[in-house]
């Protein structure tokens, strides 16, 4: 929960519903972009028994949790429901929801549901093994996390659900539907299904037809910031919002996060440091990576696309290290009243740049067409406890995350011609002052850190405000509301050192992938169908 002693003179407020992988939040903002209050609840996406890789999205429980968050946010803000001028929803991407022909939700899965591994392989073989390339050239997506293999899985194993299905949306659209009763998708989130055209920002039914799937389940497409409907009497009773409150189209979490960071113009670059690290570059026109290493998504800004290269489990790796090895530091941080990561950063700051040559092996650079990683490990450890200890390993992890990030950005620059002149660093990772400086040193460009680091909800609130005329436009409002906390200038003395570390890491990582290929080690993560 977060609360600020600030009010909007008019008494107008906006609500964002943010459905993340691990939790759902209802966040209230004033019109100046200040967060007033937030209600939050964790949720779990449980596997279906005897369905390997499944990650079911519990529609009933998760709506109840959302309603709980809305009521909590209103209570903490000490606001009547009538103060909320509009609401919009955003969510993790790739997660889909199916509805029957009467509009009732009947099935859903979360973002990294991997049950359809066999179906991915099956679809890849279509058109003389050229179907995935056709999908990518149209949508900027591969089959790895797209909706088509999941629909094919339903046709194979749950034909009852497949036959009943009348409409498909994303999870953000499901929240909007539960509030308003209306069904539509926005391009930024629906683009991750692999069934939306990057240029027209509309569905491509022929892709489903080529896969032998039904193309009659595609809902209307409405741009982010468009009025969808109004809170129904039933929804008002369940969640505590006022009946008749406008419900506005939201979108995908990363794209709305970029809006909240003011990353709205071609050439701008952001690194969003959460569980995954997303390296995002706004492209001047829809183009694709000829090597198919990078995904291309519609931005929430009409006509704009984003190249997105993902580092896998970066934040999760840091949490694992903290919880597995730093019990002492957690207790000390608690006694000092500081965050454990801050304490670990203070320790790591005393370690020389380069971390004595220790090489973490966790996420690879994104290879979207053949997406898998080596087994987690540390390479080149020393038995000297003065040089090889928790502080060294923690610094090595931060440096490696920055190296992978720089490689991902270089990969985007290679096919797009767009090279970052500065980077906006946001998300939980941006709280680390040492990490922010390391990112600047490794990338060689200034790194700007915003005041609001979890910007997705703010971007979603901006969409809500645009939808009811409280703001003029998405891009202008995003630029106006973002405020900067600090900027980090690259230390040129570290450039050659980190370049050498990157070259060494790339060579070692290639060898480590070979161990996975031989079946000697287990991949950190492997995309369905590999």
Swiss-Prot record:
Q: Which GO terms describe its biological process?
A: carbohydrate metabolic process; quorum sensing
Q: Short name of one Pfam family for this protein?
A: FGGY_N
Give yes or no: UniProt keyword Electron transport.
Answer: no
Q: Where in the cell?
A: Cytoplasm
Q: State the superkingdom.
A: Bacteria
Key words, A-Z: Cytoplasm, Kinase, Transferase
| EC number assigned by the record | 2.7.1.189
User: Which EC class does it fall in?
Assistant: transferase
- Similarity section: Belongs to the FGGY kinase family.
Kindly provide the name given to this protein in its UniProt entry: Autoinducer-2 kinase
């Amino acid at each position: 929960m977060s609360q600020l002693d600030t009010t909007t003179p008019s008494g107008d407020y906006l609500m964002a519903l943010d459905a993340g992988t691990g939790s759902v939040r209802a966040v209230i903002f004033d019109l100046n972009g200040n967060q007033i209050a937030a209600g939050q609840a964790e949720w779990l996406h449980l596997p279906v028994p005897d369905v390997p890789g499944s990650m079911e999205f519990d529609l009933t429980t998760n709506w109840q949790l959302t309603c709980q968050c809305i009521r909590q946010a209103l209570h903490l803000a000490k606001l009547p429901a009538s103060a909320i001028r509009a609401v919009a929803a955003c969510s993790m991407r790739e997660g889909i929801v199916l509805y029957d022909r009467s509009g009732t939700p009947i099935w859903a899965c979360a973002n990294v549901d991997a049950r359809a591994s066999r179906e991915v392989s099956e679809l890849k073989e279509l058109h003389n093994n050229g179907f995935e390339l056709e999908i990518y050239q149209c949508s900027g997506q591969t089959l790895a996390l797209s909706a088509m293999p999941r629909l094919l899985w339903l046709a194979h194993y749950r034909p009852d659900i497949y036959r009943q299905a009348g409409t498909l949306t994303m999870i953000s659209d499901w929240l909007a539907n539960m509030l308003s009763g209306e069904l539509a998708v926005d391009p930024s989130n629906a683009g991750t299904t692999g069934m939306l055209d990057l240029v027209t920002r509309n569905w491509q039914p022929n892709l489903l037809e080529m896969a032998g799937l039904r193309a009659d389940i595609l809902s209307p497409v409405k741009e982010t910031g468009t009025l969808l409907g109004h809170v129904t009497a039933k929804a008002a009773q369940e969640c505590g919002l006022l009946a008749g409150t406008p419900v506005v189209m939201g979108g995908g979490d990363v794209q709305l996060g970029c809006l909240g960071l003011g990353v709205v113009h071609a050439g701008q670059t952001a690194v969003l440091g959460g569980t995954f690290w997303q390296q995002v570059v706004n492209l001047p026109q829809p183009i694709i990576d000829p090597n198919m290493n990078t995904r291309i998504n519609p931005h929430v800004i009409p006509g704009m696309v984003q190249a997105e290269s993902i580092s896998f489990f970066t934040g999760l790796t840091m949490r694992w290290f903290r919880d597995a090895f730093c019990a002492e530091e957690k207790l000390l941080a608690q006694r000092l009243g500081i965050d454990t990561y801050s304490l670990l950063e203070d320790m790591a700051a005393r370690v020389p740049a380069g971390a004595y040559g220790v090489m973490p092996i966790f996420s690879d650079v994104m290879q979207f067409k053949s997406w898998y990683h080596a087994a987690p490990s540390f390479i080149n450890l020393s038995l000297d406890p003065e040089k090889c200890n928790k502080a060294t390993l923690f610094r090595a992890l931060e440096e490696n995350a920055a190296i992978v990030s720089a490689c991902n950005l270089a990969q985007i620059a290679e096919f797009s011609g767009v090279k970052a002149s500065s980077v906006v660093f946001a998300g939980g990772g941006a709280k680390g002052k040492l990490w922010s400086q390391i990112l600047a040193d490794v990338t060689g460009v200034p790194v700007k850190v915003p005041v609001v680091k979890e910007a997705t909800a703010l971007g979603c609130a901006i969409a809500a405000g645009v939808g009811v005329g409280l703001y003029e436009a998405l891009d202008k409002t995003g630029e106006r509301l973002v405020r900067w906390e600090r900027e980090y200038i690259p230390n040129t003395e570290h450039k050659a050192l980190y370049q050498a570390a990157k070259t060494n890491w790339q060579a070692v990582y290639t060898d480590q992938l070979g161990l996975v290929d031989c079946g000697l080690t287990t991949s950190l993560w492997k995309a369905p169908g590999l």
